[in-house]
């Protein structure tokens, strides 16, 4: 039996989300259909609002609804340290930890030649430009996931930064190989930041 077209379209839309297969998408579609109309309207407005109002900070690449994100525009942050993360959700994880008060740079991905993702596809060039324009930065912390792609990206960035004589460090043990930063608890992240090592 085929679903009516509007439901089929909704199932297809949900299946575009990462990790959502046909069964989950179908369940979500029927749940959405049973929601009060106001909740559905609020949900759709939230989707449109996030697409219209959220953009990348021109300095660090974090997501923001302002011209420049709150972290970059905060003069009380440590201007001598930049932590490089893969995604905004990783930045949020470190902010929730509350132990790091420096700046960030969000790559929005990692190098993955198999997937056709090279240096031009992620936010590396702007990091190098940022470092060239800012003499205050003394350390760059590469806080990337411990995956082959994360490791190769860290090494690539490290080689680009070395000539600038800026200290480049990597998060310490505490994050197991293959683990994602967003799922690590605050104690693990704190130990990783405190025990970072030079590259």
From Swiss-Prot:
Family to which the UniProt record says this protein belongs: Belongs to the RecR family.
Known function: May play a role in DNA repair. It seems to be involved in an RecBC-independent recombinational process of DNA repair. It may act with RecF and RecO.
Organism classification, top ranks? Bacteria, Bacillati, Bacillota, Bacilli, Lactobacillales
Give the domain of life.
Answer: Bacteria
In the record, which residues are listed under signal peptide?
none
**Name the record gives this protein:** Recombination protein RecR
Zn-finger segments (C4-type): 57-72
A Pfam family the protein falls into? Toprim_4
Q: Key word Iron-sulfur present in the record?
A: no
Q: What molecular functions are annotated in GO for this chain?
A: DNA binding; zinc ion binding
Q: Which UniProt keywords apply?
A: DNA damage, DNA recombination, DNA repair, Metal-binding, Zinc, Zinc-finger
Q: Which CDD domains match?
A: TOPRIM_recR
Toprim domain boundaries: 80-176
GO BP: DNA recombination; DNA repair
